[in-house]
């Protein structure tokens, strides 16, 4: 059985509730090798859908890079972000999101 708990909960409290649990942190802040399951992890060479020959460092860079806003089009520079930081493109900066472009 798989249970999902808030990242904000302490490990100790999760283990009290589920004593036999194996805790798998797959966020971009994970401390072990499971960090590789985070959409922010820069594996590199991930094909951008519907974009012949275009690749990105991570899944989140594709998602954010293809996002279109009222005040901004796609951001292909995002595809090269390998820092796991500054990947989010926000409403505050770019306006209302209109959706995602089908490729570049």
List the predicted regions and their residue ranges.
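Charged, low-complexity intrinsically disordered segments
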Residues: 1-104
């Amino acid at each position: 059985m798989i249970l999902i708990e808030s990242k904000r909960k302490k490990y100790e409290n999760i283990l009290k509730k589920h004593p036999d649990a194996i805790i798998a942190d797959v966020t971009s802040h994970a401390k072990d090798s499971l960090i590789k399951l985070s959409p922010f992890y820069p594996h590199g060479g991930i094909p951008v859908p519907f974009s012949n020959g275009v690749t990105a460092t991570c899944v989140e860079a594709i998602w954010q890079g293809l996002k279109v806003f009222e005040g901004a089009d796609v951001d292909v520079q995002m595809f090269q972000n390998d820092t796991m930081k500054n990947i989010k493109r926000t409403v505050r900066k770019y306006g209302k999101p209109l959706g995602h472009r089908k490729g570049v």
